[in-house]
């Protein structure tokens, strides 16, 4: 088992069978000791965050499997903090796809002249480049196509999958009286036919969720959902 990548919140290992093993860490993204799913650096370490992220990821990926939504997930071992996944080809140097139900975070920083904090959004989907140096800039459908990162047809598939997946997560959270404000997803091409599938994770570390108007920390979110 060889280390192929050490990430902000996970390490990636290549397995002998050609699949990969993701090792979840207790680091979360943020700035100045404050959690922020949109941040480009590790902001703090939260004991138990890795296993909490994996428990939610396992829950949601298995839920998506029931809905026949393609993902890279194979299986997981929560006690060891590991998840076995299929190999995936990312788009360009990596894309992040955000689905927004309320105006917060970077949306407000960009559109605060027109938007109100917490304003309801209709599952607004936007794509950003994974580019720390340029602070993950948003990119349009046409630009993705013209730069050879994603075809127009692939963009439509990506957007449709994002809305479906985000809707499922939103519904699961609402069963616990929790409101999903936004969620960040990643996709890649998998298997011989290179179909688009969800990759990475779905956890408290890549979403903002609120209960009774109060923000829920990632570890608390896992406890509320899994209980």
From Swiss-Prot:
Reactions the enzyme catalyzes: 5-amino-1-(5-phospho-D-ribosyl)imidazole-4-carboxylate + L-aspartate + ATP = (2S)-2-[5-amino-1-(5-phospho-beta-D-ribosyl)imidazole-4-carboxamido]succinate + ADP + phosphate + 2 H(+)
InterPro entries the UniProt entry points to: SAICAR_synt/ADE2_N (IPR028923), SAICAR_synthetase (IPR050089)
Gene name in the database record? purC
Instruction: Copy the pathway line from the protein's UniProt record.
Output: Purine metabolism; IMP biosynthesis via de novo pathway; 5-amino-1-(5-phospho-D-ribosyl)imidazole-4-carboxamide from 5-amino-1-(5-phospho-D-ribosyl)imidazole-4-carboxylate: step 1/2
Keywords assigned: ATP-binding, Ligase, Nucleotide-binding, Purine biosynthesis
What EC number(s) does its UniProt record assign? Answer: 6.3.2.6
A GO BP entry is:
'de novo' IMP biosynthetic process
Q: Which PANTHER family does this entry report, sorted A to Z?
A: MULTIFUNCTIONAL PROTEIN ADE2 (PTHR43599), SI:DKEY-6E2.2 (PTHR43599:SF3)
- One Pfam family for this entry, by name? SAICAR_synt
UniProt family annotation: Belongs to the SAICAR synthetase family.
Species in which this protein is naturally found: Clostridium tetani (strain Massachusetts / E88)
Q: Which is one GO molecular function term here?
A: phosphoribosylaminoimidazolesuccinocarboxamide synthase activity
Q: What is this protein called?
A: Phosphoribosylaminoimidazole-succinocarboxamide synthase
Report the SUPFAM superfamilies cross-referenced here.
Answer: SAICAR synthase-like (SSF56104)
- Its domain of life? Bacteria
């Amino acid at each position: 088992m060889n280390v192929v990548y050490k990430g902000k919140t996970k390490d990636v290992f290549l397995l002998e069978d050609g699949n990969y093993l993701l090792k979840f860490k207790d680091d979360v993204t943020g700035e100045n000791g404050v959690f922020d799913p949109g941040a480009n650096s590790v902001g703090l370490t939260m004991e138990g965050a890795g296993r909490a992220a994996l428990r939610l990821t396992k829950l949601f990926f298995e839920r998506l499997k029931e809905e026949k939504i393609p993902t890279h997930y194979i299986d997981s071992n929560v006690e060891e903090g590991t998840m076995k996944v299929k190999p995936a080809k990312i788009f360009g140097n990596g894309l992040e796809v955000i689905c927004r139900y309320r105006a917060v975070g970077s949306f407000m920083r960009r559109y605060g002249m027109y938007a109100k904090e917490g304003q309801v959004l209709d599952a607004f989907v936007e794509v950003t480049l994974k580019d720390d140096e340029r602070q993950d800039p948003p990119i349009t459908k046409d630009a993705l196509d013209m730069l050879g990162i994603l075809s127009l047809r692939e963009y439509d598939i990506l957007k449709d999958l994002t809305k479906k997946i985000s809707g499922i997560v939103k519904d699961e959270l609402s069963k616990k009286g929790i409101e999903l404000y936004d969620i960040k997803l990643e996709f890649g091409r998998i298997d011989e036919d290179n179909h688009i599938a969800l990759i990475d994770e779905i956890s408290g570390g890549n979403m903002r969720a609120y209960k009774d108007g109060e923000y829920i920390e990632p570890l608390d979110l896992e406890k509320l959902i899994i209980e």
